[in-house]
Amino acid sequence: MLFFTSCFNGSRELEVPKSKHIYINSISSASSTELRVKAGITIPLIGANGNSENDIELSAHHNSTPIVVKKDGASFIIKLDRELNANDEISLIATSEGIPSISTVARVLGAPKLLRAKGEWVHFDEGSSRVQVKLSIEPTKEVAYYRLIVRSKWYSESLGVSPGTLLERKIVTLGNPLFPQQKDQLFNEVNNAPFALLSLKNESDVTFSYYDVKLENSPDAPVKMDWEYSAEVELQRISKDYYLYLLTCMDSENNNAFENPIKIHSNIIGGFGIFEIYTPLTTPILIK
C-alpha cells in the first residue's frame, strides 16, 4: 500500500515516504466493548522489502492497566470488560523490527446532551421533500466537536414493511453552512454514508435539513396506505483530532493533489492514521 499523505502527529504537506512507518486506523464507539485496530506498514516507492503487516506487535493499556490484544489478520482486537466512561483512556504502542515505534492515546469525552430534536416537512417537489430540524444541545464551556448523522424510514404493516426495518442514512445540509456534507469513504469501507460536522461553544440550537421522499395518500385513492414515518439523529461527541482529521480528509477529496499539497491530520506519534473513540447519543426526531 502506498501512502501519499504524511501524517506525523499533525498535518504536513504531501510527501512520498522514503522509509517505512507504521500506520493505525481505528474509529470506535465508547459504547462498544470491542475495539478493532487496523495496522500496517507504509512502503517506500523504491526499495520496498522486508517487514509485512504480520510483523507488527501491538500493546494496549486502559487507564495505565495492560489489556489483552488479539491478532486478526491485518487487524488487532481489543476486548474490554466494560463500556468506556468519560475520561477513560486507551493507549496503544505498535512496534516492528527496524521501524520506529508509534504511540497514540484516545480519551473518551462526555456524552453530548440532547435536549430536543423537532422537525417539520417544509417543502416537497416532484416526490422529493425536505425536513427542517431544530436540534437543541446543552451548551459546553469549551469548544465541543460533533459528527451528526440522520437516519429515517417509512414502514407499513399492511404492506409487510415492519417498524424494525433498518433506517437509511440521509444527506444533511446545515442551516448555517459551517461545513458541507461529505461521504465518510476514507478508512470506512462498510458504512459509506453522509454526515455533517459541527464545532460549538456556548451555543444550544443547531438548524439543519435533510431530503427524503414524502409518501402521502391521494385524496381520490380507492385504498389508503397506512404509511408511518420515523427519523432519528445520532450526535457523536468527537475529539478535536478526529474533527481535524475528517476536515483534512474532506479537503484532500475536494482538491487536486497535484496542484495543492494534501495535508491530513493525525494523532499517531511517529506514524500515520487516526485513533478515535467517540461518544454517541441517538434520539428520535419529533416531526409534525
What is each PLM-predicted segment?
Residues 7-288:
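A sequence/structural signal for flexible, mid-protein segments enriched
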Residues 1-6:
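Sec-dependent bacterial lipoprotein signal peptides
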